[in-house]
């Protein structure tokens, strides 16, 4: 009995175990399938970008809807910066995740959307990576300043890109490769509303057709960039806007800062009124962006995609309005130009959280790739910020050793490009512990050989004193008489096919052509097949020789006659010494002895263009010069100097011609009676024109042989110069200052309310020497900005004590700290990839606000500085 009960118990137990095991396996299989499905549903990504939106001047204070959605519903990054305060370079960094020195877009003009950018960096934007992994990518709005709409950038399935720079009306967009012009109708053409409608319609359509495909959209607004045209319903808001009046407002001049700050004085009353109106109009344009964010949020909520969508909101750089006396603009390394708004809202983001770590525009691309589940490419300089957004997960309550988040505390701010030659020279100076430049100049000027005004034999340099009392060293210019003597004394020798040493000049030889050879030459010249040697003047400027090779023999075009006033055909004789030249002329002085040179046959290319007496442009657009220029450094230097002098002379001539042309335009006579026959329509006039045409200058005749490609290039360059000239003329002479970037503002600039009716004025916003590289550091103990300018000027601001960068305190910083800052700056200037461009924070002493110091782990490699 016991045995039967025991057997029954075992049977029931085995049945229960089998049932439990099968249910467990089924549960595991189901859980794995669900996790796999969730893994396949990747989140949507929406990047909202504004143009020129600041943080320091209070632009976010009026955007209540955006702050409610993004700040209260997501994470706020209170230390968000851009690595360059320029539109096109910053946007290029956002797309590629690279510093400016790695994508080579330094300004809004140079290389912006150029063929080099299109071939090298555009195929490696985050859009390309996402598109290749199944994301439906779409772009709406402003792309790059110089984008011309002729192509669709790679990686974008839907493309609605603005052609050229920001506008709200009267613009052109490229819709999937087709250009579409818009006018001045608010209901149909207002740019902010247009791209909002386009993006919402695309999202709805895409989810309806491809419900399981994730979407990545960029909505790139033109606001609050100029011309600051607001929607009509917002044109009366904020009449007393004053958020832009910060402690640095109209704080000028600043003699302790770099050159443009020293040059800029306090604003005039008309400038101050302009800043007030400008701030008001900028805030009005942002109201349409605020409405756009609300519409986007509501659309996502209606479609049930809000909890599966990451929304990122930021700007390409900041802005200043009146700060340090600068009426408006960007491009400065100070916080008002490099701080930007930065918010992220998404599935793993805690609402209302604040992130104190530094985030940059170069972090956008790696972050977007990380959201999509992709690794960061090694050539990207930024890092994903998702690790800063991880929620605190419950773990072992007995575990006390939690890893702290290690993040950068320093980054590079750069603007402009240094010439390589100058950069290397400065690099050598900085690393040699030499005296400052002004002290070295002072020592040199104490030497007797530099104190005379280029009067000593062989003197190459002289010291002078400028108007401010500074000593300068200038190179002595050789007088024209010395140059003429030097040219005449240069001997003409055979380039030789000698077997001894082709680089050696062995002097004169006794070689002379035989009588038979000279007879063969004369017969060749009388031959009708030699008529291609048309009579013409080979040169009109002083030179030495020009070589012609015929039947294995080398002939020289004798150009010594160039100094004569009366031009005549030049003889070409076989190469020999001067005495044999004279004998040959006496013996073989027959008329047939001279061979007339034709410039087109000198180098064997009948359609080549003679640019100088030694260089030609061949039909295949390549340049070919005499071998001497490629073999002799002296000849190369002389010819380059000659070309530079010719360019300078032609530029002066062009300037004079433009002045005469302007004079003629101003003194244009009254219109004549066109029914009468003009002088040049008469027979005499026609003959005169034909006569002039048949006696063209040799250079002009050769210029007619330029191919159509070169002519098109010149025509485009001429038109570009004319456009620049018209802009300068529109500004006026008083607003076109050398070395400065200036603008004029008048009553016609703003075409929408509120209008400007106080007349025109001129203001300068930047300078050509405003090139710099800066370190910006933010951590628990330090908050500073250190800058090196291309002029050699240094700036240092401690934001703990001077949050508005009012005073440059570089003179109070210890030399050892400056050396370390310079070394760290040089490392970041050449970094490549996120491993080099995001160094671990250096160990800083826990100093007080009076200052701290770096660990002295580096040598003093740099000692030449100027503050």
Curated annotation (Swiss-Prot):
Biological process annotations from GO: bone development; cartilage condensation; cartilage development; cell adhesion; chondrocyte development; embryonic skeletal system development; esophagus smooth muscle contraction; glial cell-derived neurotrophic factor receptor signaling pathway
GO MF, one example: N-acetylglucosamine-6-sulfatase activity
Manner of cofactor binding, per the entry note: Binds 1 Ca(2+) ion per subunit.
Protein keywords: Calcium, Endoplasmic reticulum, Glycoprotein, Golgi apparatus, Hydrolase, Metal-binding, Signal
Post-translational modification: The conversion to 3-oxoalanine (also known as C-formylglycine, FGly), of a serine or cysteine residue in prokaryotes and of a cysteine residue in eukaryotes, is critical for catalytic activity.
Sequence ranges of Basic and acidic residues compositional bias: 498-513
Chain residues that bind Ca(2+): 51-52, 87, 316-317
Main location, first listed in the record: endoplasmic reticulum
Top-level lineage group: Eukaryota
Keyword Transport: no
Expression tissues: Expressed in the ventral spinal cord and paraxial mesoderm as well as in the floor plate.
UniProt EC number: 3.1.6.-
PROSITE patterns for the chain: SULFATASE_1
GO cellular component terms, A-Z: cell surface; endoplasmic reticulum; extracellular space; Golgi stack; membrane raft; plasma membrane
Glycosylation sites: 64, 111, 131, 148, 170, 197, 240, 620, 769, 779
Modified residues (3-oxoalanine (Cys)): 87
Endoplasmic reticulum keyword on record: yes
Cofactor(s) recorded in Swiss-Prot or TrEMBL: Ca(2+)
Signal peptide (from-to): 1-22
Residues at the catalytic site: 87
Localization per Swiss-Prot or TrEMBL: Endoplasmic reticulum; Golgi apparatus, Golgi stack; Cell surface
Ranges where the record places region Disordered: 494-522, 842-867
Family, per entry: Belongs to the sulfatase family.
Biological role: Regulates Wnt signaling through desulfation of cell surface heparan sulfate proteoglycans.
Protein name: Extracellular sulfatase Sulf-1
Organism: Coturnix coturnix
Gene expressing this chain: SULF1
């Amino acid at each position: 009995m016991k045995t039967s009960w025991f057997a029954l118990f075992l049977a029931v137990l085995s049945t229960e175990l089998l049932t439990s095991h099968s249910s467990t396996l089924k549960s595991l299989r189901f859980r794995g399938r669900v996790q796999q499905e969730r893994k396949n549903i990747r989140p949507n990504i929406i990047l909202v970008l504004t143009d020129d939106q600041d943080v320091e001047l209070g632009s976010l204070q009026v955007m209540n809807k955006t702050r409610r959605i993004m700040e209260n519903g997501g994470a706020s990054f209170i230390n968000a910066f851009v690595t360059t305060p320029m539109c096109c370079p910053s946007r290029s960094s956002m797309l590629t995740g690279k510093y400016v020195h790695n994508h080579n877009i330094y300004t809004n003009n140079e290389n912006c959307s150029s063929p080099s950018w299109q071939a090298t960096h555009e195929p490696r934007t985050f859009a390309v990576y996402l598109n290749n992994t199944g994301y439906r990518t779409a772009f709406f709005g402003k792309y790059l300043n110089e984008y011309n709409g002729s192509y669709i950038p790679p990686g974008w399935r839907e493309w609605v890109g603005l052609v050229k720079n920001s506008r709200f009306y009267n613009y052109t967009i490229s819709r999937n490769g087709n250009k579409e012009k818009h006018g001045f109708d608010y209901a149909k053409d207002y740019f902010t509303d247009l791209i909002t409608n386009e993006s919402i319609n695309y999202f709805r359509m895409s989810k309806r057709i491809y419900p399981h495909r994730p979407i990545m959209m960029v909505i790139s607004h033109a606001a609050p960039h100029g011309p600051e045209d607001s929607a009509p319903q917002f044109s009366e808001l904020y009449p007393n806007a004053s958020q832009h009046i910060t402690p640095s407002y109209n704080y000028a001049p600043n003699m302790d800062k770099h050159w443009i700050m020293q040059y800029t004085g306090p604003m005039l009353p008309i400038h101050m009124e302009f800043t007030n109106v400008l701030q008001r109009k900028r805030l009005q344009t942002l109201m349409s962006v605020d409405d756009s964010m609300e519409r986007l949020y509501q659309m996502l909520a209606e479609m049930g995609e809000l909890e599966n969508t990451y929304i990122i909101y930021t700007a390409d750089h900041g802005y200043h309005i009146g700060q340090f006396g600068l009426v408006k603009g960007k491009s400065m390394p100070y916080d008002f130009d490099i701080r930007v708004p930065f918010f992220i809202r998404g599935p793993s983001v805690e609402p209302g959280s604040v992130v104190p770590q530094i985030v940059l525009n170069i972090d956008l691309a790696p972050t977007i790739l990380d959201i999509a589940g992709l690794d960061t490419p090694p050539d990207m300089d930024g890092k994903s910020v998702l690790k800063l957004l991880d929620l605190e997960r419950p773990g072992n309550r007995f575990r006390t050793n939690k890893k702290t988040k290690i993040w950068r505390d320093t980054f590079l701010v750069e603007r402009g490009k240094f010439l390589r030659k100058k950069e290397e020279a400065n690099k050598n100076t900085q690393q040699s512990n030499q005296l400052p430049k002004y002290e070295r100049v002072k020592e040199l000027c104490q030497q007797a050989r530099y104190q005379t005004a280029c009067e000593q034999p062989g003197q190459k340099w002289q010291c002078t004193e400028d108007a401010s009392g500074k000593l300068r060293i200038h190179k002595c210019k050789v007088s024209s008489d010395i140059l003429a003597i030097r040219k005449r004394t240069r001997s003409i020798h055979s380039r030789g096919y000698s077997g001894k040493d082709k680089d050696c000049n062995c002097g004169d030889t006794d070689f002379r052509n035989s009588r038979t050879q000279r007879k063969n030459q004369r017969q060749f010249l009388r031959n009708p097949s030699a008529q291609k040697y048309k009579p013409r003047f080979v040169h009109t400027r002083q030179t030495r020789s020009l070589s012609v090779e015929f039947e294995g023999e080398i002939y020289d075009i004798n150009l010594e006659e160039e100094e004569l006033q009366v031009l005549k055909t030049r003889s070409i004789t076989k190469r020999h010494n001067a005495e044999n030249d004279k004998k040959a002329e006496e013996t073989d002085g027959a008329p047939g002895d001279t061979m007339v040179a034709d410039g087109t046959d000198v180098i064997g290319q009948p359609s080549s263009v003679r640019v100088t007496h030694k260089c030609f442009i061949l039909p295949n657009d390549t340049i070919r010069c005499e071998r001497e220029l490629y073999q002799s450094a002296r000849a190369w230097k002389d010819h380059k100097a000659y070309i530079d002098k010719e360019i300078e002379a032609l530029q002066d001539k062009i300037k004079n011609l433009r002045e005469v042309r302007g004079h003629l335009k101003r003194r244009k006579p009254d219109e004549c009676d066109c029914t009468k026959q003009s002088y040049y329509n008469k027979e005499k006039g026609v003959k005169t024109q034909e006569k002039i045409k048949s006696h063209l200058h040799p250079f002009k005749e050769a210029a007619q042989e330029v191919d159509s490609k070169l002519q098109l290039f010149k025509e485009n360059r001429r038109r570009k110069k004319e456009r620049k000239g018209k802009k300068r003329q529109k500004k006026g002479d008083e607003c076109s200052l050398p070395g400065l970037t200036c603008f004029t503002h008048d009553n016609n600039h703003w075409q929408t309310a509120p209008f400007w009716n106080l007349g025109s004025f001129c203001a300068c916003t930047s300078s050509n020497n405003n090139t710099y590289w800066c370190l910006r550091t933010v951590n628990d103990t330090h908050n500073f900005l250190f800058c090196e300018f291309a002029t050699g000027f240094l700036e240092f601001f401690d934001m703990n004590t001077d949050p508005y960068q009012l005073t440059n305190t570089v003179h109070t910083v210890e030399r050892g700290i400056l050396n370390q800052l310079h070394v760290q700056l040089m490392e970041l200037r050449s970094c490549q990839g996120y491993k080099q461009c995001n160094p671990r924070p250096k160990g800083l002493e826990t100093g007080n606000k009076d200052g701290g110091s770096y660990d002295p782990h580096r040598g003093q490699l740099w000692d030449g500085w100027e503050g």
